[in-house]
Design a protein with these regions (language model features):
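C-terminal structured "cap/appendage" subdomains that terminate the fold
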Residues: 263-268, 274, 284-303
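A positively charged, amphipathic N-terminal helix/segment that binds anionic biomolecules
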Residues: 1-148, 154-261, 265-272, 277-281, ...
Length: 331
């Protein structure tokens, strides 16, 4: 059973000793129980992390915290907690897909507004999340790590040439990303906001004419309001990964070819700027991965609607069908 813990409360600390690590309770008593020492060692908090904190309970959702060389707080979560988080993320994917037309329709309305208006700029950021599959960004990461996302992109990262927006920037973990977007509405906004003072790419003018950068808080609030549920920018990448993988499976099934896992994950990893391993573990829905061997009847692919592609509609149907089967089995 997982217990939610407060990492700001006193916990277990560690010190280097001759044969590895020694651990001390919050009261300063050295831990000698072999099973407890083994538990703490298995957490595998990197030796270079300083000011280490370990959860006194083996059931805490956070098992350890440390600070890396750049002073960033790093967490080690309980494996069961991580599994629960991943399961919840995938469980809500069908709900996200069904609500996506509401968001896309709202973005279409707002992105046609005055290019420097708040809602227009926020809509442009959401369009970039949808089309470019990039992270939303966080100003703290941009300042401390020099890694960027949609809301923290600088003008120097963007080049508009003709009908193309080219982005080149350093993403999470220092990965250099290059992508090209051709969406007309997005380009129209970018051309205008690049003329505003300041380094940030996505800025809007407030009531007194001051340029204000779009933030992840703005974007997530916009998404939640439009979709009517507690969704956020992070859901786009999970959704896109599963759709791209399903599209690859459909294409292979149409030609009668066999789907290899590496070939399936490569386009997903490229689109998200991750490794194939990360794409498999954290982004592509397990049910879609299962189709690699089970196959998919491409003839049953739904028609495109205004706001959803055939693969997106097929993914929703697949997830709904599986949920119904699970519900029947549990009844």
């Amino acid at each position: 059973m997982i217990v939610y813990v407060d990492p700001d409360l006193p916990g277990i600390t560690r010190k280097k000793v001759c044969n590895g690590w020694g651990y001390w309770t919050a009261k300063g008593v050295r831990i000698t129980d072999r099973d407890e020492i083994d538990r703490l060692n298995k957490i595998a908090l990197p030796p270079a992390y300083v000011d280490a904190w370990f959860c006194p309970s083996p059931h805490g959702h956070i098992q350890a915290i440390g600070y890396d060389a750049k002073g960033r707080r790093q967490y080690r979560y309980h494996l069961d907690f991580r599994a629960k988080q991943e399961a919840e993320k995938f469980d809500r994917l069908a709900h996200f897909g069904r609500a996506l037309p509401l968001l896309r329709a709202q973005v279409e309305r707002n992105i046609a507004g005055r290019p420097t208006d708040r809602d227009t700029v926020i809509a442009a950021v959401v369009r970039l999340l949808d089309e470019g599959r990039i992270r939303v960004g966080n100003e703290a990461y941009a300042t401390e790590n020099k890694s960027f996302g949609a809301t923290t992109l600088r003008n120097r990262h963007a080049t508009v040439k003709g009908s193309k927006l080219s982005l080149q920037y350093r993403a999470k973990s220092g990965v250099m990303r290059k992508l090209t977007v051709t969406d007309r509405g997005l380009l129209r906004v970018v051309r205008k906001v690049q003329d505003l003072p300041g380094q940030n790419l996505f800025q809007y003018l407030n009531d007194d004419g001051t340029a204000c950068p779009a933030t992840s808080t703005n974007v997530n609030a916009y998404i939640k309001e439009a979709m009517g549920e507690d969704f956020s920018a992070k859901h786009f990448r999970t959704w896109s990964a599963s759709v791209i993988a399903l599209e690859h499976i459909v294409a292979a099934c149409r030609t009668g070819g066999k789907v290899k896992l590496a070939d399936l994950l490569e386009p997903v990893a490229e689109a998200l700027g991750n490794t194939p391993t990360v794409a498999r573990k954290s982004y592509v829905h397990p049910l879609v991965l299962g189709l690699k061997d089970a196959g998919f009847d491409a003839k049953t692919l739904p028609r495109r609607t205004r706001w959803l592609s055939p693969a997106e509609r097929a993914l929703i149907a697949l997830l709904d069908e599986t949920s119904e089967e699970v519900a029947k089995a549990a009844a």
